[in-house]
Each structure stands twice: as C-alpha cells, then as structure tokens.
Amino acid sequence: MRFVLDGSSVGSREALHRALRETLSLPEWYGKNLDALYDCLTDLREPVELEVTNAAKLCESLGGYALALLHVLRDSERENENLTVSWQE
C-alpha cells in the first residue's frame, strides 16, 4: 500500500504522531513517539510505501525532531524490507 504524509499539515510533534497514526493506520498501542514508530514500522508484514511530501515545511516546523524522524524512517526501512520511504521537498 502507498501512503502520503503531507509535511505542510504537521505543525507540532503531537500533530506529526496523530498524522502518522491516521495515515498508516497504526495500532491502538502506538505510543506517539519515535521509538513506538520504529516498532510499528519494523513490524509491518505487508509492503508499504510512505512518501513524505513538503519535507522542507516539516523540517521548518519541527526542527531537529524532523531529523530524528528521518533517522527513524531510514533505520526502519533498512530493518524491514516491506517498507519503502521517500521524501519530497
């Protein structure tokens, strides 16, 4: 499945995790933090493509947290062959 996360609609950490939960249909136990996101993404059993659009806006809004998100997404992608992540400015 293909999912798109629009970085221009994310203005805070809380909004980011809410958008990720809704976009990816994450489980109820999702802890709304990067460690929980990693756990969910590395546990995917079906192929998932996640495209983050307006990444520059996401970085502007979240600063260093956006960089931490990028690391989590890349690490999750390396760990789980069912996950593909792309970023678009």
Q: Where do the language-model regions lie?
A:
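Positively charged, polar, low-complexity stretches
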Residues: 1-89
